[in-house]
Amino acid sequence: MTTRLARGLGIGASAIAAGATVAAVGATALSRLSRPSGEPGVLTNVNGLPLHALIHRGDGPTVVFENGLACACTEWSWVLRDIADRYSYLAADRPGCGWSGDDGRRRSAREINELTAQLLTQHDLPAPYVLIGHSIGGLLAMSFAAAGSHDIAGLVLVDSSHPDQLVRSSAQRDAMPMAEHAMGSLFWRTLSGRKPSRVAVSDLDDLPEHEAARGHRLMERPAPWRAAVREIRTFDAWCEELRTATLPRSLPIAVVTAGKTDVGDSKHGELQADLAAASDVSRHVVLAEADHDNIVMRADHAAEVGAAIDWTVSHSTAQARKARSA
């Protein structure tokens, strides 16, 4: 995560600081917290919670996507278009984001992974799985891979969070309370019926036109901002889960880093390189013109993410052949 969003939001005076409560906003505002209709994918009941996902059945392994903070699965639109002729995929919305329902629960990384695993099972999407995570979603992808309960072909980390980033980076540490405050401000702003500031959602404009319009409508609702606050407050616990986890050294890992994130945090590149160093079979690409959000939402950057998926699949196949011949 970066400070770019927090800087651009004008977070000085929020409804939270004024002591607002949901009850004080009224019934009309509460209705804005309901799950939106018009979902582009399928809804699946998982333990009583409606979860939305984009699902495609194709050849090759199944690519499993984990979205960035507050983002819907449609943030991957360009990537999904790119890989649809080669792979199956599951791109799901976490509780409270996109078109998924929300029960207000804080979940551990393991519990989020269990929701994903149930979606894979219910929709009969076969292993092996290539896990791909953007931003905070990278923590969840790494956690899923480290659990060792599924056949994992590889891991793709796109400007991913690092489990030690708040320890090793003062910029990330300082940004965390600003990010929480910013997301809280956006929650109250949208709950009261006001649109988010343009700068907060401007990267959505890089998506295909129809998805950009749909994304803007989603982010005018308070639910994703509430979910973002919850996930920020759970971030430390997710990191702690990963500190005690181990990834196989033979697992192919592709890391795709946004070069512009380095501008605000001199430690970012070091942390990204550290993610790649977790495997003996790794690839690290830095996209100089990409920022933290458009690295998946802009078509040219998304093509590089698709290439990272291809690299991971090819090296997973090579690793499997090597293991069989040993």
Please annotate each region the language model reported.
Residues 91-130:
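Active-site loop/oxyanion-hole signature of alpha/beta-hydrolase fold enzymes
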Residues 49, 55-99:
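Conserved HGGG/HGGXW glycine-rich cap/lid loop of the alpha/beta-hydrolase fold
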Residues 64-68, 134, 159, 258:
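The conserved beta1-alpha1 loop
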Residues 93-98, 161, 290-291:
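Short beta-to-alpha linker loops that shape the active-site pocket of alpha/beta-hydrolase fold enzymes
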Residues 127-169:
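Conserved hydrolase catalytic core segment
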Residues 2-30:
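Hydrophobic alpha-helical topogenic segments used for membrane insertion/localization
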Residues 210-286:
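Conserved serine/cysteine hydrolase catalytic core
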Residues 280-326:
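Catalytic active-site module of serine/aspartate enzymes centered on a nucleophile-bearing elbow/loop
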